[in-house]
């Protein structure tokens, strides 16, 4: 989702446009609008559902740039079940406690849509909010039966044996839906139109860089940092 941001930083696209960018990791996507509102962030990457909920709730946020897109070929996020849980399909999630990195955020909303499409009432699943770094420990400790997670956290969980991928449910989602958007306060964009434009242009250049197969190793290295 944020690969273009990492690449733009690593390849110097921000610096080329005289942007000083400090990347901050926000464990729960649902807290990004509040961080923008308090000026802890100038630009943040909420999921579309989190952004819309924030605007509907009265926050004066605007979009600066797009982000990642869904694809049936992407297996970078999915349902990761605790070892020994027996979860194999949507029906097995009924009555289970499942951690999601932000209630109402993209992974939570799309997972519920997948359950619905599979004939499962999401209200029969107990969802709890859990940040990505917590996922492995929550599975090991048995606090949750599964998590809706994403790489690199998902890969670390499976490699450690704490859990297994029960479904790459993202492969069932429609193509080319936004997974995250880059947003800012309207006031900040009005005062800094050049910076907002330079940020967007940097991501466009990074996206073009990522589309070239010869750059795959550099892209993976940038994301890994």
Regions found by a protein language model. Name each.
Residues 1-131, 138, 145-152, 162, ...:
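Short, glycine-/small- and polar/acidic-enriched structural segments
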Residues 133-224:
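Pocket-lining segment of extracytoplasmic ligand-binding domains
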């Amino acid at each position: 989702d944020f690969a273009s941001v990492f690449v733009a930083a690593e390849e110097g696209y921000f610096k080329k446009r005289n942007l000083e960018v400090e990347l901050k990791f926000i464990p729960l996507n649902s807290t990004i609008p509040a961080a923008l509102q308090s000026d802890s962030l100038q630009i943040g990457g909420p999921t579309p559902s989190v952004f819309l909920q924030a605007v509907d709730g009265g926050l004066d946020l605007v979009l600066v740039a797009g982000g990642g897109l869904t694809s049936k070929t992407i297996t970078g996020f999915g349902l990761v079940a605790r070892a020994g849980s027996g979860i194999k399909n949507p029906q097995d999630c009924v009555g289970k406690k499942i951690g999601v990195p932000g209630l109402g955020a993209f992974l939570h909303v799309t997972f519920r849509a997948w359950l619905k499409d599979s004939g499962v009432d999401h209200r029969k699943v107990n969802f709890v909010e859990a940040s990505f770094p917590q996922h492995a420990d929550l599975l090991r400790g048995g606090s949750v039966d599964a998590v809706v997670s994403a790489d690199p956290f998902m890969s670390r969980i499976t490699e450690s044996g704490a859990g297994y991928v029960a479904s790459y449910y993202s492969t069932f989602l429609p193509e080319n839906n936004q997974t995250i958007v880059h947003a800012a306060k309207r006031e900040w964009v009005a005062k800094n139109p050049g910076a907002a434009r330079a940020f967007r242009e940097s991501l466009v250049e990074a996206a073009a860089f990522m589309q070239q197969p010869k750059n795959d190793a550099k892209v993976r290295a940038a994301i890994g940092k």
